[in-house]
Curated annotation (Swiss-Prot):
This is S-ribosylhomocysteine lyase. Belongs to the LuxS family. Its EC number is 4.4.1.21. Binds 1 Fe cation per subunit. It comes from Streptococcus uberis (strain ATCC BAA-854 / 0140J).
C-alpha cells in the first residue's frame, strides 16, 4: 500500500496569493527538539510571470551568500520549478516579517551593490550549469520586485 501524503505547496491556491511575499509554510520539530522553518519566498505572481533561468540562477547563488550574511541558521534556499520564487529552509523559529526584511535587504544589495566578482559559484568547478547566469537579469528582477514591495503576508499586502 502506498503512503498517502499531502504536499503543502500543491494545496496552496496560487490564484489568490499576492506576490512578492514571504510566507511561513511550516515549522517542523525534530525528535530532540530541533526546529526547522520552511518559507515560501514568492518573488513574482504565479501564473502571470516567471523569472528566466539565468536570472533566477544568479539570484539563487547571491541569496545563498547574502541571506547567510544577514541571519544565522540558513540551511538552504532553492528555486521553485515554476521559477516564481524560492523555498527557504532555516534552523530555528523565525517569523515571516524577519525573513521578509532579510530578503528585501538582500534584493537591495543585488539591485544596487553587486558586481560580477561578487557572485559566488560561477566557475565550471563550482557550479553545475556555470554558463547559465545573468547578473543583468538578476539586477533587473531585483529592482522590479523591490518596486512592488515585499509583503510578510501572502494573501494581503503588508509591506516590510
Amino acid at each position: 500500500m502506498t503512503k498517502e501524503v499531502i504536499v503543502e505547496s500543491f494545496e496552496l491556491d496560487h490564484t489568490i496569493v499576492k506576490a512578492p511575499y514571504v510566507r511561513l509554510i511550516s515549522e517542523e520539530f525534530g525528535p530532540k527538539g530541533d526546529v526547522i522553518t520552511n518559507f515560501d519566498v514568492r518573488l513574482v505572481q504565479p501564473n502571470q510571470n516567471s523569472i528566466e533561468t539565468a536570472g533566477l540562477h544568479t539570484i539563487e547563488h547571491l541569496l545563498a551568500k547574502l541571506i547567510r550574511q544577514r541571519i544565522d541558521g540558513m540551511i538552504d534556499c532553492s528555486p521553485f520549478g515554476c521559477r516564481t520564487g524560492f523555498h527557504l529552509i532555516m534552523w530555528g523559529e523565525h517569523s515571516s516579517t524577519e525573513i521578509a526584511k532579510v530578503i528585501k535587504s538582500s534584493l537591495e544589495e543585488i539591485a544596487d551593490g553587486i558586481s560580477w566578482e561578487d557572485v559566488p559559484g560561477t566557475t565550471i568547478e563550482s557550479c553545475g550549469n556555470y554558463k547559465d547566469h545573468s547578473l543583468f537579469a538578476a539586477k533587473e528582477w531585483a529592482k522590479l520586485i523591490l518596486s512592488q514591495g515585499i509583503s510578510d503576508q501572502a494573501f494581503e499586502r503588508h509591506l516590510v
